[in-house]
Amino acid sequence: MKKESPLYRHIRLPMKILLIFFMSITVIGFTYKYFDTTDETRMKMTQLERSLQDLKAAMSIDSVRNFHISKIMSIIDVYNNELPPVAKYEIANEIYLASIKYSNLDVDLICATITHESAGTWSPSIKSHAGAIGLMQIMPATGVYLAEFEDISWTSENEILTDPIYNIRMGTRYLSMLVSYYGVDGGLAAYNGGERQASLWIKANKADGILWAETENYVPAILKLWDKYKAQNL
């Protein structure tokens, strides 16, 4: 049996909701036209109206989701237009799910972090000279630790950390934890340069000369990208 493409489901779901919505409207109109408004009929009408309200809410939620996924895919295209459409969709969907799971991360901040961490490549297989791997540049030792929280069976650093879905799950969990401890600026500093330096920096009211030179450039670079993506519309 042929497996359905997730990209196809992305398009098909709103169509299903719309079809149900218009069918429900037809049923309501038919009921009003051909039946007396007895108590039983009014009760059924009320139930139908509630169902319609639920459908409208579902359509609204799905519309927001589709907007964010389309936006993320357009960002990916800027940096890596050779990534297959299904892979782009799956990455975008995982980023959106992470933004729902972690209230202190939004889609734009996650995308900004990935853009900078991957050196503007959005390549799932990218590796740094220091040994960090994947979209969110996770060190293998950190990956082993985070994999336990995500119920990911660790096989090898290459297999797990170059998997973009696993990488995003682990990276966003780690970033969210750091942001909850140190705020956005401090969380980004800790993600890049370690918690000790970030903690000292926050305690010193973000004074110059405490963070590593790389981290001093890293934090404002991601904040700039974050602002750019927040202002970006399709």
Task: Go through each PLM region and give its residues.
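Catalytic glycan-binding domains that act on GlcNAc-containing polysaccharides
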Residues: 55-234
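N-terminal secretory targeting signals
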Residues: 1-89, 227-234
